[in-house]
Amino acid sequence: MSFRKVVRQSKFRHVFGQPVKNDQCYEDIRVSRVTWDSTFCAVNPKFLAVIVEASGGGAFLVLPLSKTGRIDKAYPTVCGHTGPVLDIDWCPHNDEVIASGSEDCTVMVWQIPENGLTSPLTEPVVVLEGHTKRVGIIAWHPTARNVLLSAGCDNVVLIWNVGTAEELYRLDSLHPDLIYNVSWNRNGSLFCSACKDKSVRIIDPRQGTLVAEREKAHEGARPMRAIFLADGKVFTTGFSRMSERQLALWDPENLEEPMALQELDSSNGALLPFYDPDTSVVYVCGKGDSSIRYFEITEEPPYIHFLNTFTSKEPQRGMGSMPKRGLEVSKCEIARFYKLHERKCEPIVMTVPRKSDLFQDDLYPDTAGPEAALEAEEWVSGRDADPILISLREAYVPSKQRDLKISRRNVLSDSRPAMAPGSSRLGAPASTTAAADATPSGSLARAGEAGKLEEVMQELRALRALVKEQGERICRLEEQLGRMENGDA
């Protein structure tokens, strides 16, 4: 008798999410209420940026990661736009540079002081003007320095050289309707887009040509999104004709049928996908949801494997994702999200439980670093390059929690009652007599300390034996499960 495979082996099967304590959240932030399906949040290893409500224009907060707790209403903002800010994105090659797109039809690039803002920042480093309607999408090139993509409600995609404020490419005939999102591939030679006409397009920006197109990737009328994966596949989220939320995986070489298609639920919030190329895990966050679902993408069918769901009580207004080089590798942290509530930002840590305190090579392969692989001029000339990788081993800090320290009192230094006059032995110095009198009590104290130490050691040995017994039991159960899956039992 054969059994259907119930459990797929995966090192990410036990990933769990944990919100941080309240004192590590960012409180009293007036998150933007603008109706736009943006993340409203961007984060890097130094700063957290959140689009906020602002009177008389658009603004966003930039906070050092360490500035947790209540944020004063008078805290300075980045406030140079004359209309609401719709999207923000940190430069992957400079942690102090951020770009913003706004309803005022402009893109602005800002230089944040190394230690954060001490006064409102109103003067951008660069203003990029080329759109005729509001700019809702900002995306830096992953490997070329100073190359920035913007897309607006004029259905135009512009690619800029920020260093010279020059418009490099204008793609104004490839999208007949509103663009929902864009995503670069790993080396920045192509990007994919999701459009209101229900099509997913793969575009070569330097040639200005359509490489591939899939009409009605999702048949529902609600917003959809598309992202490139590291292997060149395209992952999409959207809605079915019956308004059920869907996930799909596509091969750009053949967009006729999806490699995989899954239906999630019938909620109406747009699904925002966040992809980790190092682990091939996609985290899906629905706007207005109170959960984060995560899936592992593999090369074997069914390709999209559900892992787990993190659930909380409050719905999310937006979400930011920390780059891999900003995680705490010594705590086996594989992702960290910054969830926007109505009035605060709450970090959520995703962790893989591991027994060992050693650096986990399988969880942390070399990842994209902050160094650009190309200059803008090289990319324009036709060159492509993968991201320059760095090791996270240097960020690993060994845990010291397992060190057993026994603190022993110096019993000879204890204060003692004064001896009665004449109680010393005849001819013996008082200090000698005191030391002699202290010797029996000192021995008793040391014996008591030794007894406590022995109790601790016995308890430690008992715990080790229990852990070993449970480990053996788990191994037996896994073997039994394996035999059942293979039809041997």
From Swiss-Prot:
Residues 449-474 form a coiled coil. One of its GO terms (molecular function) is actin filament binding. SUPFAM superfamilies: WD40 repeat-like. WD repeats lie at residues 80-120, 130-170, 174-213, 217-260, 265-305. Transmembrane segments: none annotated. Pfam families: DUF1899, WD40, WD40_4. Keywords: Actin-binding, Coiled coil, Cytoplasm, Cytoskeleton, Phosphoprotein, Repeat, WD repeat. Phosphorylation on Ser-2 regulates the interaction with the Arp2/3 complex and cell motility in fibroblasts. Phosphorylation does not seem to affect subcellular location. The keyword Coiled coil applies. It is found in: Cytoplasm, Cytoskeleton; Cytoplasm, Cytoskeleton, Stress fiber. Forms homooligomers, but does not form complexes with the other coronins. Interacts with Arp2/3 complex components, including ACTR2, ARPC1B and ARPC2. Binds actin. Belongs to the WD repeat coronin family. Regulates leading edge dynamics and cell motility in fibroblasts. May be involved in cytokinesis and signal transduction. This is Coronin-1B. It comes from Pongo abelii. The lineage of its organism: Eukaryota, Metazoa, Chordata, Craniata, Vertebrata.
